Curated annotation (Swiss-Prot):
Location (main, coarse): cytoplasm
Name under which the protein is recorded: Peptidase T
Residues engaged in binding Zn(2+) 2: D143, E178, H382
InterPro entries: ArgE/DapE_CS, Bact_exopeptidase_dim_dom, Peptidase_M20, Peptidase_M20_dimer, Peptidase_M20B
Enzyme class: hydrolase
Length: 407
């Protein structure tokens, strides 16, 4: 179905810079996310008919309720999307609208960048559709402002059509998903539902209930700096220690070599001097045993290097971030079966594959609310080549409406 306000709503949202900050110690991590919640989303939620709309300054969540208008529909369903965008320029987002895409290259604004079907064959899935792209200087922010726009549009449709019967609906827009801490302070007591969905997936049909298990790894290397002219048998180069550590990890177990259910080690940052260096990694895997084995491996590498050095110069700090939500959701597949049924009735083929990433639903599922993930439309997310199809967004709205009417 077409929805009059969906595109304008999405464009309005993405023009607001809500980039999160991994180095911040506040919640939300950036003031712009709170401002976006309070000045744009909250008034709009109230205007379209959501009740008890409130912002929690402790966890950064904006929550609203649409009560059931049919007492026989007893389920309570939640929909969640995140307000922040990834670690890429989000200032002065200037979306391009490509009507009736006919294939071929899409030049991104006046930049030297283009969307090329040879580099991005997923473009070929969108012939004849309306695409929203960047101008080549920023990301788009469809991850996850497409999800926010879809939830808002579904609620607006339901409140404008009171004859359409639906169950109790809860809506939550949260912060800092992209830096892995968005759901850390989520309050289940403030979101009383039987199950929920994050609208944070990619192409049409995605329905996901398996995520990575994730850990953050920080490794500090302590060197000993002396003049290079007299360094023989004295200097210990911390940067070289970092290189040695990295080379001891399996070379083919990196993101660029893995897919499907394969896990990886990913070096995300490396800084330092001869005296001290620091390497940042993320560790990902699906199965609990292999996830734990990866963490043991880095500990063993550090221990081996320290033994060879004769002192503790490789310091490892490991922190689990989230876990594969399959462990929770497979105990009660109601949310998955309902979503599959609704999609099939809408002639959408459910694409059930693992998420090679995580969502807020991972943590929320372990808090007691099964929260699988549904497509929101974004492609090539987290960079200048991001785009989204308006038609896919419309279908996501259809799914939301179908879920609450069938509950």
């Amino acid at each position: 179905m077409k929805y009059d306000n969906l595109l304008d709503r999405f464009i309005k949202y993405v023009k607001v810079n809500t980039r999160s900050d991994p180095d911040s110690e506040t919640t939300p991590s950036t003031e712009s996310q709170e401002a976006f919640a309070l000045t744009i989303l909250k008034p709009e939620m109230e205007a379209i008919g959501l009740q008890d709309v409130h912002y929690n300054p402790v966890n950064g969540y904006l929550i609203g309720t649409l009560p059931a208008n049919n007492p026989t529909l007893t389920r309570k369903i939640g929909f969640i999307a995140h307000m922040d965008t990834a670690d890429f320029n989000a200032e002065n987002v200037n979306p391009q609208i490509i009507d009736n895409y006919q294939g071929g290259d899409i030049t991104l604004g006046s930049s030297n960048y283009k969307l090329d079907p040879k580099a991005f064959p997923n473009l070929n899935n969108y012939i004849g559709q309306t695409l929203i792209t960047t101008d080549g200087t920023t990301l788009l922010g469809a991850d996850d402002k497409s999800g926010i726009a879809e939830i808002m549009t579904a609620i607006e449709f339901l409140t404008s059509q009171p004859q359409i019967e639906h169950c109790d609906i809860k809506v939550a827009f949260g912060p800092d998903e992209e830096i892995g801490v968005g759901a850390d302070k989520f309050e289940v007591a403030d979101f009383e539902v039987d199950f929920a969905y994050t609208m944070d997936g990619g192409p049409l049909g995605e329905l996901q209930y398996e995520t990575f298990s994730a850990a953050a790894l920080e490794v500090t290397f302590l060197g000993r700096n002396v003049h290079p002219g007299t360094a023989k048998d004295q200097m210990i180069n911390a940067l070289q220690l970092a290189i040695d550590f990295h080379e001891k990890l399996p070379a083919k177990e990196r993101p660029e070599y893995t897919d499907g259910y394969q896990g990886f080690y990913h070096l995300t940052g490396l800084t330092g001097t001869v005296e001290e260096a620091r390497a940042s990694y993320i560790i990902r895997d699906f199965e609990e045993a292999s996830f734990e084995a990866r963490k043991v491996k880095v500990e063993n590498i550090a221990q081996s290097m320290n033994a060879q050095l004769g002192t503790k110069r490789v310091l490892v700090e490991l922190n689990d971030q989230y876990y594969n939500m399959k462990k929770v959701i497979e105990k009660d597949m109601t949310a998955i079966e309902l979503a599959k049924e609704v999609m099939e009735e809408l002639a959408i083929k459910p694409v059930i594959e693992p998420i090679r990433g995580g969502t807020d639903g991972s943590k929320i599922s372990f808090m007691g609310i099964p929260t699988p993930n549904i497509f929101a439309g974004g492609e090539n997310m987290h960079g200048r080549f991001e785009f989204v199809s308006l038609q896919t967004m419309e279908r996501a709205v259809d799914v939301i409406i179908g879920l609450v009417c069938k509950a």
